[in-house]
Amino acid sequence: MELVEVLEGKAKILTPKAESIYDAPVFYNPRMALNRDIAVVLLNVLKPRIVLDALSATGIRGIRFALETPAEEIWMNDISEDAYNLMKKNVLLNFKGELEESNGRAVLKSEKTLVVNHDDANRLMAEKHRYFHFIDLDPFGSPMEFLDTALRSVKRKGILGITATDGAPLCGAHPKACMRKYLAVPLRGELCHEVGTRILVGVVARYAAKYDLGIEVILAYYKDHYFRAFIKLKDGARKGDESLENLGYIYFDESTGKFEVERSFLPSKPNAYGPVWLGPLKSQEIVEEMLEISQQLSLARKKQAVKLLKILKDELDVPLFYDTHGLGRRLKIEARKIEEIINELRSLGYRASRTHFSPTGVKTDAPYEVFVNVLSSAK
């Protein structure tokens, strides 16, 4: 296996040389550097002490956590023997000391403790029951096969980071796959990125409730063909009940672009999409702190990270949005400038903002009829 050195953030790692990242014996995707940047920023805000990157491959995420965050004990795990051996090399490339190895587990103790583990992620998380303050699940595809075990491995007031890269099911191109994996009916079309994000958060809420756990969404977003959520667990059956009250369904009229949301454990009408999470997709206070801290860190994609966090900070936190191009096409209305629409909605007393889910979308608490009137009359 021929290796090349790569720099990302403060880390330097060896990765397999290959024509395509998908051909490499150990997976490293440089396009996910921004995903890792946002996780680094969050860990600098929340400061979890013991963290796990459950599906580590080269170890880049865990090594960056060790180098760039206050985390004190960092676990990196992969079922691949090639990945395990490469992670050990990469740890020693970034940290002084010797690895103490036994039974598929290598430990380096210095100012921080780094653990490189060779095992199935579910088996490791089952072994370390209620051990981690933060677990990051970043699989190739869906995280669902790891969710149950992660909810039992993280502390009862811990934090889960979850990435889903299977956009086709969550965006409604493969609805049966979404129903199998996420137990929800997806919505195809211009709203799919937000609906997919809310399906992902919603299934975490349902799984957590089994263990008398509620959830608080620290941040959930869509970027570069992946869905991402950071979720803090809240201990107690009552917290689980409260989280389930934030589940519901979406009704969407394809001919008009009008949508309705319904908070309910079961839908009251046919043709419902969901269940989805209808609660907040961010903690405003934490996102503001993340934006501030991101400007002080040496991130791999700093400009992109700051830009994304600024958009997320300013985004109105209400379910769904109106796509100006989609509505214009349906209603045969000429598309208007988004800032013009937002300003007019605000002048009428409604809240409104851009949304990161779509460059042509507007989030607002204005009714559909008001929005259409503004869309058609804005000058």
Swiss-Prot record:
Cross-referenced Pfam families, in alphabetical order?
TRM (PF02005)
Keyword annotations for this protein, in alphabetical order, are: Methyltransferase, RNA-binding, S-adenosyl-L-methionine, Transferase, tRNA processing, tRNA-binding
InterPro entries, A to Z: SAM-dependent_MTases_sf (IPR029063), Trm1 (IPR002905), TRM1_arc_bac (IPR022923), tRNA_met_Trm1_C (IPR042296)
Q: Name one GO biological process term.
A: tRNA N2-guanine methylation
EC number(s) from the headed UniProt entry: 2.1.1.216
| Stored HAMAP family | tRNA_dimethyltr_TRM1
Check the record and name the NCBIfam families matching this protein.
Answer: TRM1
Task of the protein: Dimethylates a single guanine residue at position 26 of a number of tRNAs using S-adenosyl-L-methionine as donor of the methyl groups.
Write the protein's name. Answer: tRNA (guanine(26)-N(2))-dimethyltransferase
Q: Which organism is it from?
A: Pyrococcus abyssi (strain GE5 / Orsay)
As recorded in Swiss-Prot or TrEMBL, the protein's gene is named trm1
